[in-house]
């Protein structure tokens, strides 16, 4: 079983999720570690756009995190052969 968990961890590290929101791009691994944050819309860097960039960062992060959780669950089922939700 340890080998399967190790295989799962290695697989999750290699899967990169990309989420975009209003000029903000977040790349996150399927193990929910942020790889990169890119501000594609440089107009967001204006002091008057502070609230817009904060909102876009939050939404992009939440999108990336949700997708990472979804992918991690799928990989867990694939590699370990069971749905972790069934254990609850």
Where are these regions (language model features)?
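A short interface-forming secondary-structure element
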Residues: 34-53
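N-terminal intrinsically disordered, cationic/polar leader segments
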Residues: 14-36
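Long amphipathic alpha-helical segments used for membrane anchoring, targeting, substrate engagement
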Residues: 1-18, 67-88
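Residue-level signal for functionally critical sites in structured catalytic/ligand-binding pockets
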Residues: 1-9, 30, 49, 55, ...
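Stable alpha-helical structural segments in soluble proteins, enriched in small hydrophobic residues
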Residues: 56, 60-71
